[in-house]
């Protein structure tokens, strides 16, 4: 009886530990694109980023807490820059500063994401 109870307790603890383990999934390009889509006008025309754009930059910052997340976001940003040919490099580089957000992911076509 006690042996069966001990096995049940160990099994329950193992399941709880698996469920409590944080996800290893890195941030997706869809998440990065959604966050920064409001910034396209600023990135292509310059000026001042909109409130929605800066909110997206803050959202991107909150998504990039781990090294894997930062690398994934960096690669997504490079892919997005390749898709949108009109993006001004200087505007992209200044975006986080203009929004008052210290990003751990540089927004640049030339960044080495490793």
From Swiss-Prot:
Q: Does the keyword Nucleus apply?
A: no
Q: What's an example GO BP annotation here? A: lipid transport
Task: Give the superkingdom in one word.
Answer: Eukaryota
The record's InterPro entries line, in alphabetical order, gives: Bifun_inhib/LTP/seed_sf, Bifunc_inhib/LTP/seed_store, Plant_nsLTP
Per UniProt, the keywords (alphabetical) are: Allergen, Disulfide bond, Lipid-binding, Signal, Transport
Q: In which tissues is it expressed?
A: Expressed in seeds and, at very low levels, in pulp of fruit (at protein level).
Q: Does the keyword Disulfide bond apply?
A: yes
What the entry lists under CDD domains is as follows: nsLTP1
Q: Which residues form the signal peptide?
A: 1-25
List the Gene Ontology MF annotations in alphabetical order: lipid binding
**Disulphide bridges, residue numbers:** 29-76, 39-53, 54-99, 74-113
- Pfam families cross-referenced by the UniProt entry: Tryp_alpha_amyl
What's this chain's function? Plant non-specific lipid-transfer proteins transfer phospholipids as well as galactolipids across membranes. May play a role in wax or cutin deposition in the cell walls of expanding epidermal cells and certain secretory tissues.
Q: Which family does it belong to?
A: Belongs to the plant LTP family.
Identification of the protein by name: Non-specific lipid-transfer protein 1
What is the scientific name of the source organism?
Actinidia chinensis var. chinensis (Chinese soft-hair kiwi)
The organism's lineage is: Eukaryota, Viridiplantae, Streptophyta, Embryophyta, Tracheophyta
């Amino acid at each position: 009886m006690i042996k069966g109870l001990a096995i049940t307790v160990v099994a329950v603890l193992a399941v709880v530990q698996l469920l409590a383990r944080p996800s290893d999934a890195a941030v997706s390009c869809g998440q990065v694109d959604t966050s920064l889509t409001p910034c396209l006008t600023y990135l292509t025309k310059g000026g001042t980023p909109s409130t929605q754009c800066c909110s997206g930059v803050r959202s991107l910052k909150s998504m990039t807490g781990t090294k894997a997340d930062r690398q994934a976001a960096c690669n997504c940003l490079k892919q997005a820059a390749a898709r949108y040919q009109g993006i001004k490099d200087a505007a992209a580089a200044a975006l986080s500063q203009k929004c008052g957000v210290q990003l751990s992911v540089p927004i640049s076509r030339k960044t080495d994401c490793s």
